[in-house]
């Protein structure tokens, strides 16, 4: 009985283990696993369908085909359990052992394992110091290798050709030993003394000075050390015996019609067995050497193909011309074991169907079709029916459910009540793509979804489908309810603002409610309370839009009826002022945010639901609709267009007269049209946005229009100003697919209709948009995958790591304007030191406290500009990040809890908006979004002008001209605080003087945005140097205008440097500043503006460099730029940056490059070579600081790291990534990018190993490095030195500690090969490894601390 009982027992927890180790298996190990040798290539007998004996499916080796039944049928049933049949040799046992029992094949001749041979760097090659070519020659029987030179002049490991070998044998006879094939390689490997080798190599390394040699030695040492430290033997990389996979993992399935479907592995094994058997037979027959050799080579190839098809030689194809899937292919790629079956499993208890809107659901509910619920909750229903006594057996319950009797439906209702289900919409780009709801049973076949959660799911109702999943265990239900319920996910984890915000109809309805209409019924009446207003409205005495006065508390408030009705749904804690305005989408989002912060989560949920109901009701009542009459075309449109045409004509004239180049003509034309489009749009908005309403007494008031199109755009419900511009203004400039802007715009709008040509130009942009969208999705998904992989194991690991370090944050400025306030950047972070009031020096925020909304207000009021905060970048936790360094968990609005998987949240927050980023496209059906070039700066606040680091001269017209690069103008308020600051472009005309008081909006400076001038600071006569026509300068004749201009061209000679010098009246070169000379070097492409001998005044333009033809403003924009930053690739034409502070000088030019010399006050000068034709942005005598670029272009992040250190490079990466997202209007909190950058900066490169075991140039994780160094210091040994290392996200993911995680990411075979040689142990610390091993993840409720609670 006991035995029977053990059969039905539930299996206990699967094998409990703490780590996984991977090794190379020894031949003994393989024989140990095996249950018998496979000797024949046969599979099964096609007539009896029984497996052949000793074949690939042999029942004697692998176990019976049917449960408890031997092959010949002598023993059947349970009573013979464990008996081995004497007739057919099959053990009587469950057939599932065929999934786990392995066999083996004894090879007649050893073969090399292809992974250890071909996976670069080749493991076998590195141990023997042979190249891959040489190794293959030996293994594939092309050359002999010397095993023992004996008394000959040969060396061990030398290769001999066939002829050379014969010759040596004739000369020396058997005085030396050489071999061929895998046997000889095996002999060499077995004879290696690794300890001795390692010592020799280390010595050699310390002696050599050549970098290349050192790298090579380090590579070899790494592999030798791996073998030394693991228990692997090098000769195991050559195999005498190969394992055979259990047959049920490579099944053979009979199809109808007597044919079989088989796994490719069976074909591959069959080839190996056939060749092996043939080789054995040939060896027995003592066949000639050449035949045996050929057979051995074929065996080696067959085994290669079995392990990794296509790695060497031709890919073997099956009968259907498709490549056969080898063992490696089973693991690799999206369809491989890792990503298909371990990381992405399909689950039971799930269903999917179309979604429809559920306008009367509460936020925590979803509508579930009864049919679906019945299927999903079957086991629960069976259980309940039995409990209630309707049925006695499961079978009866099943029948009852199939008949769908009334009791079944009642039971279903009971089961479903308060049972959360999870809804998921693919693609799940962030964690809000799966949320839990309580199901409400409905008729019909579609899931009903609450409209407010659509933003989070990115769902709409045009045929989207969603999947339902049922959490089965009590723990799963609790997690679904507490963590995943839609009501607990009001804030977005990416930026901490509410994500449950009304949109579309709801916004429109509430906007309509809160608008004011003049002369409405009941205008200016006074009411004593909200209730009174409600009565008047219900009785029809006051209109919804009437302006009224209402007593609120103890004051009288001017408001409208609609706003009072809206205020009825507000929670107590919120003031009436929150809704006493026109409510558009932005204001509504703010309302929900305010409610969350003041009244709490429950009130917010109720408010959201009530807003939804009100919004729908009033949107319906308003009866808004669009007609063609609503698109009013501005009266001044034709006038604006005529002006623009005239301006363009004027530019054409200037071009024809040769005053400007073709590029400038194009730039200016594009600019004029961009401005004209803006003007038409502004006129249209003016006309559509206001309307004059006549009163009963004939008086009129101008108010915001009730034009439906305007109302939809203005409320943020649908459409944008841009789209309105295209409907009723003009379509404007369009872009070619290449990204250039076509200089003739589309002057028509959709209301007027487009001509055929205009329509054709439009299709250009529109089609490119569609093609791009398809590419973008794939690219964005790949970026997300890499981000998740690099940061998956970052979790909150401890409350405080105790670091004293942090980062400095200030408001983000661009062109003098604040784009992101300091408050927005520090909200929810922890102060790293006391934050003091700059005036009173009182502590506003003590060190180590959270900077919350109130404290942000204090900091901003005090006018503090820079704050030091804790950051993930400087966190000292060994694994993960501590709560203090991370700060607030944005989705909850309070400090993060231990176990929060912040790495994955960071990756999702950055990856999810990826699809909204451009792949260099232009929005709005391809209308070019070209910002009108800035040509001037105006201040925003009153104050006094201060010039900072600004050199100026007066030119011949008496204007002040800026003569240097990094000059700035700042506006100082009366209290002496700096209000704003602007960088002044070189060559700008300054309209104010230092110390001048200015009013707001004064013109400070202006410049020509389309050219960069080269100016002189001194007076004198112009003298050309090395400017020779036909060599370095050409008179370029403009074909259209017949005018000529002098242009500097590319020149061959390296010592020629075209320049203009300014000579004084004595004919000497004039002096500039402290000992510099007035020589100006002309870059390629400069257009000379003066002639030889001209009289020159200070501030004159000697030459101008036309800017590149305007492409739409982003060099590498959008998604590719984000990927480039995270992969830290060198930008295409990266800027050279200076490594030291110093003064700029120019040296002798070399071939195609110009030499810039930076001379510091003390120490050696540094030379930088800059390609000719690149515009150098510094001048002789300029003072530069370390890290400043010397030319135009994006800097290379690696340079920033070496010059300015980790914090600066982190700051650069965070700011650059943010800039791309900001251009698209996407909000992401800095801390997410910091978490990713932390992972990129996790390692150091060893520069000096000291007394440690490290190798020169090895990459080591910081904690490990520090730990070993502290040990060395304790033992009074020399610690190792290292420099910080910045790895791209792909590189960083592949070099993680966990080989399981790395193998499931990319380059599976390489990762596994490296891991096996090193005998790596995976301690399963990250999330991914645990998912793959099928365990709970060590984050959130799966953390060890919480797991103990569960027990």
From Swiss-Prot:
Species of the source: Syntrophobacter fumaroxidans (strain DSM 10017 / MPOB)
Binding site for Zn(2+) 2: 801, 875, 882, 885
Family (UniProt): Belongs to the RNA polymerase beta' chain family.
Record-level GO BP terms: DNA-templated transcription
Requisite cofactors: Mg(2+); Zn(2+)
Gene: rpoC
Recorded GO MF terms: DNA binding; DNA-directed RNA polymerase activity; magnesium ion binding; zinc ion binding
Catalysed reaction, written as an equation: RNA(n) + a ribonucleoside 5'-triphosphate = RNA(n+1) + diphosphate
NCBIfam families: rpoC_TIGR
Binding partners and assembly: The RNAP catalytic core consists of 2 alpha, 1 beta, 1 beta' and 1 omega subunit. When a sigma factor is associated with the core the holoenzyme is formed, which can initiate transcription.
Enzyme class of the recorded protein, top EC level: transferase
Keywords for this protein: DNA-directed RNA polymerase, Magnesium, Metal-binding, Nucleotidyltransferase, Transcription, Transferase, Zinc
Binding site for Mg(2+): 460, 462, 464
Function of the protein: DNA-dependent RNA polymerase catalyzes the transcription of DNA into RNA using the four ribonucleoside triphosphates as substrates.
GO CC annotation terms, alphabetical: DNA-directed RNA polymerase complex
Residues binding Zn(2+) 1: 70, 72, 85, 88
PANTHER family, alphabetized: DNA-DIRECTED RNA POLYMERASE (PTHR19376), DNA-DIRECTED RNA POLYMERASE SUBUNIT BETA (PTHR19376:SF54)
Domain of life of the source: Bacteria
InterPro entries cross-referenced by the UniProt entry: DNA-dir_RpoC_beta_prime, DNA-dir_RpoC_beta_prime_bact, RNA_pol_asu, RNA_pol_N, RNA_pol_Rpb1_1, RNA_pol_Rpb1_3, RNA_pol_Rpb1_3_sf, RNA_pol_Rpb1_4
EC numbers for this chain: 2.7.7.6
A Pfam family per the record: RNA_pol_Rpb1_1
Cofactor: binding comment: Binds 1 Mg(2+) ion per subunit. Binds 2 Zn(2+) ions per subunit.
Name the UniProt record assigns to this protein: DNA-directed RNA polymerase subunit beta'
């Amino acid at each position: 009985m006991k035995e029977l009982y053990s059969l039905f027992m539930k299996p206990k927890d699967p094998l409990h283990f703490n780590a996984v180790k991977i090794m190379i298996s020894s031949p003994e190990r393989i024989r140990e696993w095996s249950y018998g040798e496979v000797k024949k290539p046969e599979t099964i007998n096609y007539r009896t369908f029984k497996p052949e004996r000793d074949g690939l499916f042999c029942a004697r080796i692998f176990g019976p085909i049917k449960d408890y039944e031997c092959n010949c049928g002598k023993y059947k049933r349970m009573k013979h359990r464990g008996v081995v049949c004497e007739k057919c040799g099959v053990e009587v046992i469950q057939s599932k052992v065929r999934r786990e029992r392995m066999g083996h094949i004894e090879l007649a001749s050893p073969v090399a394992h292809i992974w250890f041979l071909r996976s670069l760097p080749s493991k076998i090659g590195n141990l023997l110091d042979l190249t891959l070519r040489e190794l293959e020659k030996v293994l594939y029987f092309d050359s002999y290798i010397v095993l023992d030179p004996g008394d000959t002049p040969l060396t061990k490991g030398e290769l001999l050709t066939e002829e050379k070998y014969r010759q040596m044998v004739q000369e020396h006879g058997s005085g030396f030993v050489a071999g061929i094939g895998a046997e000889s390689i095996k002999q060499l490997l077995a004879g290696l003394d690794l300890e001795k080798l390692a010592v020799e190599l280390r010595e050699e390394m310390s002696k050599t000075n050549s970098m290349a040699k050192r790298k090579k030695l380090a590579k070899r040492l790494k592999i030798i050390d791996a073998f030394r430290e693991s228990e692997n033997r090098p000769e195991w990389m050559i195999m005498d015996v190969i394992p055979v996979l259990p047959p049920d993992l490579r099944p053979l399935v009979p199809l109808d019609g007597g044919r079989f479907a088989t796994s490719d592995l069976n074909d591959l094994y069959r080839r190996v067995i056939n060749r092996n058997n043939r080789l054995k037979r040939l060896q027995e027959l003592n066949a000639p050497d050449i035949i045996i050799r050929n057979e051995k080579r074929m065996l080696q190839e067959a085994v290669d193909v079995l392990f990794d098809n296509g790695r060497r030689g031709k890919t073997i194809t099956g009968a259907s011309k498709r490549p056969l899937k080898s063992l490696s292919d089973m693991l690799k790629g999206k369809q491989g074991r890792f990503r298909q079956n371990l990381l992405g499993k399909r689950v039971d208890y799930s269903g999917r169907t179309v979604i429809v809107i559920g306008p009367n659901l509460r936020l925590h509910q979803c509508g579930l079709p009864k049919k679906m619920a019945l299927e999903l909750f079957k086991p629960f229903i069976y259980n309940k029916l039995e409990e209630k006594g309707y049925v006695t057996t499961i079978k009866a319950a099943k029948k009852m459910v199939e008949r769908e009797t009334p009791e079944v439906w009642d039971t279903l209702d009971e089961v479903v009540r308060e049972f959360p289900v999870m809804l998921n919409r693919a693609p799940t780009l962030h964690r809000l793509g799966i949320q839990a709801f309580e199901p409400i049973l409905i008729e019909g076949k579609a899931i009903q979804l609450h409209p407010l959660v659509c933003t989070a799911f990115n769902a709409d109702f045009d045929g989207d489908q969603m999947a339902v999943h049922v959490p089965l265990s009590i723990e799963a239900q609790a997690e679904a309810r507490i963590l995943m319920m839609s009501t607990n996910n009001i804030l977005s984890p990416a930026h901490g603002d509410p994500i449950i915000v009304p949109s579309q109809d709801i916004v429109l309805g509430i906007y309509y409610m809160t608008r004011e209409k003049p002369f409405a019924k009941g205008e200016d009446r006074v009411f004593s309370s909200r209730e009174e207003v409600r009565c008047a409205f219900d009785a029809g005495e006051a209109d919804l839009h009437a302006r009224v006065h209402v007593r609120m508390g103890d004051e009288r408030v001017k408001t409208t009826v609609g706003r009072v009705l809206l205020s009825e749904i507000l929670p107590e804690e919120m003031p009436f002022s929150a809704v006493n305005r026109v409510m558009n989408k932005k204001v509504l989002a703010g309302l929900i945010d305010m409610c969350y912060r003041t009244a709490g989560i429950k009130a917010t949920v109720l408010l959201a639901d009530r807003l939804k109901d009100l919004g729908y009701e009033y949107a319906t009542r308003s009866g808004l609709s669009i007609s063609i009459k609503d698109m009013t075309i501005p009266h001044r449109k034709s006038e604006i267009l005529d002006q623009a045409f005239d301006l363009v004509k004027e530019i054409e004239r200037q071009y024809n007269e040769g005053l400007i180049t073709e590029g400038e003509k194009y730039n200016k034309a594009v600019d004029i049209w961009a401005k004209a489009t803006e003007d038409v749009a502004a006129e249209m908005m003016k006309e559509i946005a206001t309307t004059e309403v006549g009163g009963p007494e004939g008086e009129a008031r101008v108010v915001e229009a009730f034009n439906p199109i305007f109302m939809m755009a203005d409320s943020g419900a649908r459409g944008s100003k841009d789209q309105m511009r295209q409907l009723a203004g003009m379509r404007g400039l369009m872009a070619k697919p290449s990204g250039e802007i076509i200089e003739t715009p589309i002057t028509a709008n959709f209301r007027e209709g487009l001509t055929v040509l205009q329509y054709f130009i439009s299709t250009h942009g529109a089609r490119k948009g569609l093609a791009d969208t398809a590419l973008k999705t794939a690219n964005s998904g790949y970026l997300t995958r890499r981000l998740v992989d690099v940061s998956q194991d970052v979790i909150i690991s401890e409350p405080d790591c105790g670091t004293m370090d942090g980062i400095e944050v200030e408001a983000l400025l661009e062109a003098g304007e604040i784009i992101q306030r300091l408050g927005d950047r520090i909200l929810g972070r922890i102060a790293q030191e006391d934050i003091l009031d700059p005036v009173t020096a009182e502590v506003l925020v003590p060190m180590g406290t959270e900077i919350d909304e109130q404290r942000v207000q204090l900091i901003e009021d005090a006018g503090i500009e820079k704050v030091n905060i804790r950051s993930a970048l400087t966190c000292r936790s060994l694994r993960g990040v501590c709560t203090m360094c991370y700060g607030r968990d944005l989705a909850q609005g309070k400090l993060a809890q231990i176990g929060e998987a912040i790495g994955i949240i960071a990756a999702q927050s950055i990856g999810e908006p990826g699809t909204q980023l451009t792949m260099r496209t232009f929005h709005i059906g391809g209308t070019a979004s070209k910002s009108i070039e800035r040509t001037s700066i105006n201040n925003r606040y009153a104050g006094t002008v201060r010039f900072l680091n600004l050199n100026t001269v007066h030119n011949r017209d008496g204007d002040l001209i800026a003569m240097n690069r990094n000059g700035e103008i700042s506006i100082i308020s009366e209290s002496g605080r700096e209000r704003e600051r602007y960088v002044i472009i070189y060559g700008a005309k300054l309209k104010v003087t230092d110390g001048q008081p200015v009013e707001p909006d004064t013109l400070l400076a202006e410049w020509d945005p389309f050219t960069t001038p080269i100016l002189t600071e001194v007076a004198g006569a112009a003298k050309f140097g090395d400017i020779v026509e036909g060599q370095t300068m050409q008179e370029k004749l403009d074909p259209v205008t017949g005018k000529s201009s002098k242009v500097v061209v590319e020149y061959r000679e390296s010592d020629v440097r075209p320049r203009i010098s300014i000579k004084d009246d004595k004919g000497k070169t004039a002096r500039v500043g402290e000992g510099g000379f007035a020589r100006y070097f002309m870059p390629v492409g400069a257009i000379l503006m003066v002639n030889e001998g001209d009289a020159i005044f200070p501030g004159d333009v000697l030459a101008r460099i036309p800017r590149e033809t305007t492409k739409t403003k982003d060099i590498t924009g959008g998604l590719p730029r984000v990927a480039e930053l995270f992969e830290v690739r060198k930008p295409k034409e990266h800027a050279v940056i200076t490594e030291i502070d110093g003064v700029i000088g120019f040296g002798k030019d070399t071939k195609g490059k110009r030499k810039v010399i930076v001379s510091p006050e003390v120490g050696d000068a540094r030379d930088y070579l800059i390609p000719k034709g690149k515009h150098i942005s510094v001048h002789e005598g300029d003072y530069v600081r370390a890290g400043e670029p010397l030319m135009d272009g994006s800097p290379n992040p690696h340079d920033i790291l070496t010059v300015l250190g980790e914090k600066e490079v982190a700051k650069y990466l965070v700011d650059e990534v943010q800039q791309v997202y900001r251009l698209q209007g996407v909000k992401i909190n800095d801390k997410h990018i910091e978490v990713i950058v932390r992972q990129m900066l996790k390692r150091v490169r060893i520069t000096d190993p000291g007394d440690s075991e490290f190798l020169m140039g090895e990459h080591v994780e910081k904690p490990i490095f520090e730990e070993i160094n502290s040990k060395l210091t304790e033992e009074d040994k020399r610690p190792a030195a290292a420099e910080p290392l910045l790895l791209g996200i792909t590189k960083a993911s592949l070099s993680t500690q966990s080989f399981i995680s790395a193998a499931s990411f990319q380059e599976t075979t390489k990762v596994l090969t490296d891991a096996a040689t090193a005998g790596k142990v995976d301690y399963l610390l990250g999330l991914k490894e645990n998912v793959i091993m099928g365990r709970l993840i060590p984050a959130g409720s799966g953390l060890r601390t919480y797991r103990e609670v569960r027990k």
